[in-house]
């Protein structure tokens, strides 16, 4: 400020610098100060620092004051400062800042409000410099809590760490606290650093600086049906005054307290629900707790209702609540003693077994183990089970009567090869090898007796490996396997050409049936042909006493086909192609069946090894194996047919032309004869004319009349003869044309008949193939399956109508209308007027 006269108001001040001594002094108003030449005013008059009530300010580098409160000056006259220190000043008279003093500003404000500590709140403060307070020395680092409600008076030596809210403890809750350092809490209990405890007093709890609040613990409500299972983290004495060891488990029930708050050294294991038993229920408790509170491991305890209880720690109910076993009249229980005890006066040894038969109610005892609940097994006359005696090991089959296993009997499972299991589930006991299911799983109950329906005109061989002898069962029949019997599985050739092991079957069809095979033969002129043969066969078996040799040939189909193929190849090899092509059927039948003593072809081929008889053989097709040869043969056949047809047409045409020429010759001859007769008639006419001229002399009129009459007669006769000649010529021409037409129609009819015969043979072959296909499909599907398919539609319709719940129904169509006029009135019972 450059003015020499400075007017300073009340509660204002300025700093004057003496340029001679370099000392700055403070001048407070109200005053009018005249500045000297060697003085400089550092700033315009500033207001003094005013601290209102409930406020404070912090002055840095405060001046030093004596006991009277006056400012202490240095020898140079400069105000003495406590550099680096600070001073907190509260409400009072406004004061100026001496040179070197600074006002600590926070958020742009030098004067701050005193902090108000509300109720249930405290300030966590820390001493940063030793000081003495009320004859008590407070060391640096000391922390304490200033609890509200009050106004916090700050000190330079103390800093506020944080504001702490009190935690409200409600009923059925507790506050878990942990000690940070060793100290004595408010209740006078010494605490160790890291120790945890619960504060259960209701209301607001303001923690001390030595404590850390871990959280509120909610109490668990207990009832008659709910208990709390706890475990001790360390050894301590619980709230009920009971000493607990580390790892020990116990339960708190409603008898102990309605609400339990888990203590600091308690860990909740689980909520335990009460087990309620009715009069018809019981439980088996494993490892029960005795009167001393210890588990009796390995023991069991049976408890029967009516009762309600809690499972103690260590006790288990593996099987849960069970119903009292009600044993019916047709039921029994298989029991086993696990230790020695007396049962109604009878001594039971460990491991002994017995059966308790109904009707009764049974609850197992601790000394008894229930092995099985057995029931009477109802068996039809065609049903059975396998039973094994566990004492002797004997296995027997029980068939056709209700049966209950005895004490020393068990159901015996008869295991069959997987292939036999799959054949048993197939419709007719046969299956193609290519159609086998690799993932097949049998659903047969192994203890049930094995049954198989032998079809009509079929046979099954069963081998008893204990007696080492087979038996044959002829169908229709039901086979039941004894415990030591097995099926004989047939592995037959199949397909065209025959492939070994293509078909597996449990039953042997006795026939008559047929088989087809394809073989390749070679004639003497090296023509290779593929023949498709079909033959009928059957087994000549005695149905009263069937022979075992029927099953002596495992693959009778393959053996038969090989034999026939060998004979056919040998016979064809001695014939040329043309001869074999013309007489193929006769050559093959003679080769297969052979000839008798008289040279006649036999009627069948018999295999004496298994009584297998082939009765007929048919050549279904014969074609060259070489494609070019086959095409050439077809072309030659077609060419032969065309040549034959054209030759017949030429012969017919030649005959017609010959007949036409003969008719024309006869016609020309007839014309010549007619001309001769005409000339003869003319000659006679001339003679008559001469006579008439002669008569003319006698009388012209008479002669003229007579001449005219004779001329007219002659003319009429000539015309009649000409008409007859024309009619005869027309008849001859018509007959020739008719013969020509008849010959043409005969040739066309013969050609049509040959075409029809070819078409009929093709249709017959197709029909036979289709019939064979249908027959094979029917054989594969089976009669029972076809009957089920035929019945499925009507049965489904009947079930559909039955499910509608109709008492009656009427089915009609538009051609037979039904008059329902007035039906509604009759249904509601109103009489018609």
Curated annotation (Swiss-Prot):
Keyword terms: Cytoplasm, Nucleus, Phosphoprotein, Repeat, Ribonucleoprotein
InterPro entries in UniProt: Band_7/SPFH_dom_sf, MVP, MVP_rep_dom, MVP_rep_sf, MVP_shoulder, Vault_2, Vault_2_sf, Vault_3
Pfam families linked to this entry: MVP_shoulder, Vault, Vault_2, Vault_3, Vault_4
MVP repeats: 54-118, 119-170, 171-223, 224-278, 280-328, 329-380, 381-433
Location relative to the cell: Cytoplasm; Nucleus
Quaternary context: The vault ribonucleoprotein particle is a huge (400 A x 670 A) cage structure of 12.9 MDa. It consists of a dimer of half-vaults, with each half-vault comprising 39 identical major vault protein (MVP) chains, PARP4 and one or more vault RNAs (vRNAs).
Protein name in the entry: Major vault protein
């Amino acid at each position: 400020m450059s003015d020499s006269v400075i007017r300073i108001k009340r509660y204002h001040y300025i700093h004057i610098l003496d340029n001679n001594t370099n000392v700055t002094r403070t001048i407070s108003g109200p005053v009018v100060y005249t500045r000297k030449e060697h003085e400089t005013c550092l700033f315009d008059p500033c207001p003094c620092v005013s601290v209102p009530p409930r406020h404070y300010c912090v002055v840095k580098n405060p001046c030093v004051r004596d006991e009277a409160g006056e400012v202490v000056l240095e020898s140079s006259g400069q105000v003495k400062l406590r550099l680096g220190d600070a001073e907190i000043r509260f409400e009072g008279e406004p004061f100026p800042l001496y040179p070197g003093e600074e006002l600590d500003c926070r958020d742009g404000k030098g004067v701050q409000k005193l902090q108000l500590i509300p109720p249930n709140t405290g300030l966590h403060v820390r001493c940063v410099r030793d000081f003495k307070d009320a004859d008590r020395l407070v060391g640096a680092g000391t922390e304490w809590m200033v609890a509200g409600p009050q106004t916090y008076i700050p000190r330079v030596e103390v800093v506020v760490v944080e504001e702490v809210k009190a935690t409200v403890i409600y009923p059925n809750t507790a506050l878990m606290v942990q000690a940070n350092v060793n100290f004595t809490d408010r209740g006078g209990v010494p605490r160790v650093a890291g120790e945890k405890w619960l504060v259960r007093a209701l209301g607001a709890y303001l923690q001390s600086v030595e404590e850390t609040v871990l959280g509120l613990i909610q109490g668990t409500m207990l009832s008659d049906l709910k208990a709390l299972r706890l475990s001790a983290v360390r050894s301590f004495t619980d709230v009920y005054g009971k000493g607990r060891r580390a790892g020990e488990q116990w339960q708190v029930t409603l008898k102990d307290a309605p609400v339990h708050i888990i203590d600091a050294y308690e860990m909740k294991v689980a909520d335990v629900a009460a087990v309620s038993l009715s009069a018809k229920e019981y439980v088996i408790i494993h490892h029960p707790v005795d009167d001393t509170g210890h588990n009796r491991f390995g023991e069991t305890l049976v408890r029967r209702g009516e009762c309600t209880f809690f499972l103690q720690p260590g006790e288990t109910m593996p099987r849960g609540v069970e119903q009292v076993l009600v044993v019916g009249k047709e039921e029994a229980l298989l029991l086993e003693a696990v230790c020695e005890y007396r049962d109604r006066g009878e001594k039971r040894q460990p491991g002994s077994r017995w059966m308790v038969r109904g009707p009764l109610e049974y609850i197992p005892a601790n000394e008894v183990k229930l092995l099985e609940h057995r029931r009477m097994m109802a068996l039809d006359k065609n049903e059975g089970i396998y039973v094994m005696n566990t004492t002797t090991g004997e296995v027997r089959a029980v068939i056709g009567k209700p049966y209950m296993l005895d004490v020393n009997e068990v159901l015996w499972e008869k295991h069959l090869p997987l292939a036999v299991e799959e054949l048993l589930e197939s419709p007719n006991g046969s299956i193609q090898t290519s159609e086998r299911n690799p993932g097949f799983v049998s659903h047969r109950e192994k203890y049930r007796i094995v049954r198989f329906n032998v079809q009509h005109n079929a046979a099954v061989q069963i081998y008893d490996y204990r007696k080492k002898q087979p038996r044959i069962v002829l169908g229709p029949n039901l086979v039941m396997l004894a415990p030591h019997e097995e099926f004989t599985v047939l592995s037959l050739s199949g397909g065209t050409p025959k492939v070994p092991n293509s078909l597996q079957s449990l039953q042997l069809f006795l026939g008559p049936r047929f088989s087809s095979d394809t073989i390749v033969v070679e004639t003497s002129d090296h023509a290779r042909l593929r023949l498709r043969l079909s033959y009928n066969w059957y087994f000549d078996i005695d149905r009263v006493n069937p022979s075992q040799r029927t099953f002596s040939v495992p693959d009778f189909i393959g053996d038969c086909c090989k034999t026939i193929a060998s004979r056919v190849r040998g016979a064809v090899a001695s014939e040329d192609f043309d001869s074999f092509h013309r007489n193929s059927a006769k050559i093959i039948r003679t080769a297969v069946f052979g000839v008798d003593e008289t040279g006649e072809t036999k009627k069948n081929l018999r295999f004496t090894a298994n009584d297998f008889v082939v009765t007929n053989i048919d050549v279904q097709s014969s074609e060259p194996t070489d494609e070019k040869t086959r095409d050439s043969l077809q072309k030659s056949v077609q060419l032969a047919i065309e040549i034959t047809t054209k030759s017949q047409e030429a012969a017919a045409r030649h005959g017609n032309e010959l007949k036409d020429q003969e008719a024309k010759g006869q016609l020309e001859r007839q014309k010549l004869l007619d001309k001769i007769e005409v000339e003869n008639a003319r000659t006679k006419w001339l003679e008559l004319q001469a006579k008439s001229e002669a008569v003319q002399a006698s009388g012209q009129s008479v002669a003229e009349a007579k001449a005219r009459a004779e001329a007219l007669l002659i003319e009429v006769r000539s015309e009649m003869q000409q008409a007859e000649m024309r009619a005869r010529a027309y008849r001859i021409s018509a007959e020739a044309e008719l013969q020509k037409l008849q010959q043409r129609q005969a040739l066309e009819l013969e050609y049509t008949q040959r075409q029809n015969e070819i078409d009929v043979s093709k249709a017959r072959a197709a029909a036979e193939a289709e019939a064979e296909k249908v027959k094979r499909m029917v054989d594969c599907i089976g009669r029972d399956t076809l009957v089920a398919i035929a019945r499925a539609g009507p049965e489904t319709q009947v079930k559909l109508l039955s499910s509608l719940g109709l008492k009656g129904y009427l089915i009609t169509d538009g051609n037979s209308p039904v008059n329902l006029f007035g039906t509604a009135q009759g249904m509601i019972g109103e009489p018609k007027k």
